[in-house]
Structures are given as C-alpha cells and as structure tokens.
A protein has these predicted regions:
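Mature catalytic core of soluble alpha/beta enzymes
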Residues: 1-252
Length: 252
C-alpha cells in the first residue's frame, strides 16, 4: 500500500503527515498533501497573532468585526467559545494580553481538518501531528505515547486511537507559559494534561484547561457533552496520574 510521509514547516513549528492508501498511488497522495500544505499556510495567514494583516490581528486591533471575518475565522471563534463554555472558563482565548488569541485551539482544529482532507481524497491510514496535537484516521489503531514531562526520553502512557484526536499540554509544550485565565498567573493545576476525543480543536483547548485546573477539572469533565472524551493528567505535586473517560490507555 503506497505510503507518503512529509514534514511541513509552518506556524513556527513542523507538521508531520503520514498517509497511506489502498485506493490512490503515491503520486496522488503527494498531490493531496500539497493541498493540505496550502490549507495550513492559509490558516497561518488568517489566524496568526504574529502577522499584522491576519484576520486575528485585525480582530485584536479592533480593525475587524467577527461577523465580517472569513468563514474559517468565524468557525475557530465559535469553537473557542464552546471550549471556554465546556471548561468553565479555564480555557479562555479572550483573557490573554492583546485580545483574542486562538493559538490553543487552532493546531488541533487544523490537524483534524487536514486529516479529513486526506481521508476524503482516498487515504485509508492517516496521521497529522501538529507539534503534539494529533489527528488520526484509519482501519488499524495508531499507538500514541505520552512523554514524561520530567524525562522526555520516557513514555509514561500509551493510547490506541483508530479514528480520533489527541492533544497533550505540559511543561515540554510551553507549559510554563500557560496562564490561569481566572487569576492571570502561571497555571499550577497539573504537570501534564492529555485529551482524546472526536473534535481536534476541543481536545487542544481542553488539554490547556487540564493544565490550569488539574484535579479541579472534575467540576466540568463529567459534562454529558464530553462523554466521548478521555482525560489523562499527571498531578503536579505527586508522583501520580488520574484518568476519566472511555479510552483509558494501555498500562505501562
């Protein structure tokens, strides 16, 4: 079965794509990945907080109203609002300095969009890894490991995911810079937070919320709207972890 792997440098990081297909050949997979690459650069142009002419920068500068923004931007705005609601405000892209910053949602959201593009074009087995926010599709499960935030050479948990998304937030992923939107100071809830579920953007955002709340996330993870999501978190001050949800991972 033809398989193509590619690394795309964008958003100041690298996006890894692994796509296989029993329906189309490697040349066609390459063509589809080129379309995905164009989409990822469009995301950067519209949603970057670093590009002065992006729609997000214009929103932050009050030079654009959300109702006048491109559909992509409005979709992300709505997704961020939903994640804020689900997390009781522990994910809040409006609480950051300078105004609306969807960075904690966009990687997971875009990875899922890219995976859908690849599957729609005929790929059977797909992984899109946007710097730790991963979208997975396939007939066979993918094994995804979570790294120990205190020892990057150690895998502390493994999840099998066939069709879904996984996002991890921790000190190895700029965790020291995650602020608690309720207090404005550095988040001290958890050492690492992982979320698995059907929506990549929501996984990305709620992994950040886990870092903020730690075990206090118990107040919102039981929401019936999150019944398809799995949460796995390493406690900050104890050598222990806890989990909630349908995919409890593989014992290490």
């Amino acid at each position: 079965m033809p398989r193509v792997e590619k690394i795309i440098p964008v958003w100041g990081t690298e996006i890894y794509i692994d796509a296989s297909s029993s329906k189309i050949d490697a040349t066609e997979i390459d063509r589809v990945i080129a379309g995905v690459e164009a989409f990822l650069f469009d995301v950067d142009e519209e949603l970057s907080t670093f590009k002065e002419n992006s729609s997000v920068s214009k929103l932050r500068a009050n030079k654009l109203k959300i109702e006048d923004a491109p559909d992509m931007v409005q979709e992300v705005w709505r997704g961020c609002a939903k994640a804020k609601e689900l997390s009781f405000g522990s994910f809040d892209p409006w609480a950051v300095e300078g105004g609306f910053d969807p960075s904690g949602f966009v990687k997971g959201w875009a990875a899922e969009k890219a995976a859908v593009m690849l599957v729609s074009a005929g790929c059977d087995q797909v992984q899109v890894n946007a710097a730790g926010d991963i979208a997975l599709r396939g007939k066979e499960p993918w094994k995804i490991g979570v790294v120990n935030p205190d020892n990057k050479s150690e895998i502390v948990q493994v999840f099998e995911i066939t069709n879904g998304n996984i996002a991890t937030s921790g000190h190895y992923e700029k965790g020291a810079h995650i602020k608690d939107p309720h207090t404005g100071v550095i988040a001290i809830g958890a050492k690492s937070g992982t979320v698995i579920g059907p929506d990549g953007g929501i996984c990305d955002a709620l992994a950040t919320a886990l870092m903020v709340d730690g075990q206090d996330a118990a107040q919102w993870i039981g929401n019936p709207e999150l019944s398809e999501y799995t949460f796995w978190s390493i406690n900050r001050h104890e050598n222990s972890a806890w989990s909630h949800g349908p995919n409890l991972g593989l014992a290490k």
